[in-house]
Amino acid sequence: MQFIDLRSDTVTKPDFEMKQAMSIAEVGDDVFRDDPTVIKLEDMAAKLFGKESALFLPSGTQSNLVALLTHCERGDEFIVGQEAHTYLYEGGGGACLGSIQPQPILQNTDGTLDLGIVKSLIKPDDYHFARTKLLCLENTTWGKVLPLDYLAKAGDLAVSYTHLTLPTIYSV
């Protein structure tokens, strides 16, 4: 039996064929959108997920940080499991680079967060508190996939607290 380690992009090791493909891949400067391989990958991902476009990021750490910084502003907070990469690992990037405050809570043995606890941690709309802006769920935790019904309930909870303030509308 062959062991495949999917814990992290940091433990991925390309085999000979992958290294060979990399050595002959057509490359260019992605800043100028001159890298046909990256363009093809982004186009393929956008089509696969039914989106207008996609963005290639070379690591899970960078992807998680971009997601946090996309959804949160300086001084905001995100609710996250204590074992999640965006909290426990990744050098505290959200706090260090984005001035985003994590609000960690215990994860259940199946990787879920108790949604009652999540709801109790959502801060009131009061300038004395960091604004609760995001619920981060890690899929998978300890190799366990979050159940679809749980994700639906978590999504419903998050959406029920979504609102746009007048300044937010004007900054869009």
List PLM regions with ranges.
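Conserved N-terminal alpha-helix of the aminotransferase class I/II PLP-enzyme fold
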Residues: D15-G60, Q82-E83, Y87-L88
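N-terminal amphipathic/basic leader segments beginning at the initiator methionine
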Residues: M1-A21
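Conserved core of the PLP fold type I
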Residues: E52-C72, L106
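Aromatic/hydrophobic pocket-lining residues that form π-stacking "cages" and hydrophobic walls in ligand
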Residues: A154, T162
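PLP-dependent aminotransferase-class I/II
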Residues: G98-K153
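Single conserved hydrophobic/aromatic residue that forms the stacking wall/gate
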Residues: H163-V172
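Conserved PLP-anchoring active-site segment centered on the Schiff-base-forming lysine
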Residues: T70-L88
